[in-house]
């Protein structure tokens, strides 16, 4: 998303309200909102397969698995992301339906347009989550 000269940063609450009504997904970084591109077939298939395997593996554990329509909130640095797959086991995450604050696992399926960001700035942002134990990057190129 290209910011206009008249752009006014959004508060997290304004972002969540806008996102609930939007037809497309946006990431939020300290007041700035960025539209996300749609994913390709291979990307969606990999994320879906990981979701299905993790859901089956974690059944009955109290953990929940979410796919790319659930936001992860990094509250300490004022960020919202849409991970491809996310696992949370913290009961506090059941208090909010629009986002999760305590993921243990985040998986990103790499694409050419996002790989550098997923490995760099986004990873640095995710490291601010005290609950995060694993950050997994999956290449759609390798077989």
Short names for language-model regions:
Residues 1-143:
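Gly/Pro/Ser/Thr-rich low-complexity, intrinsically disordered segments predominantly at protein N-termini
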């Amino acid at each position: 998303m290209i910011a206009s000269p008249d752009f006014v940063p959004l508060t997290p609450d304004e972002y969540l309200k806008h996102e609930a009504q939007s037809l497309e997904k946006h990431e939020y970084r300290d007041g700035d909102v960025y539209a996300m591109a749609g994913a390709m077939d291979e990307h969606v298939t990999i994320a879906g397969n990981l979701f299905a395997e993790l859901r089956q593996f974690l059944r009955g554990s109290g953990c929940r698995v979410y796919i790319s329509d659930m936001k992860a909130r990094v509250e300490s640095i004022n960020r919202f992301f849409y991970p491809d797959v996310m696992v949370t086991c913290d009961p506090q995450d059941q208090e909010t339906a629009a986002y999760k604050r305590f993921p243990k696992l985040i998986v990103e399926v790499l694409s050419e347009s996002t790989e550098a960001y997923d490995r760099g700035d986004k990873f640095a942002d995710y490291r601010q989550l005290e609950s995060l134990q694993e950050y997994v990057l999956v290449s759609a190129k390798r077989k």
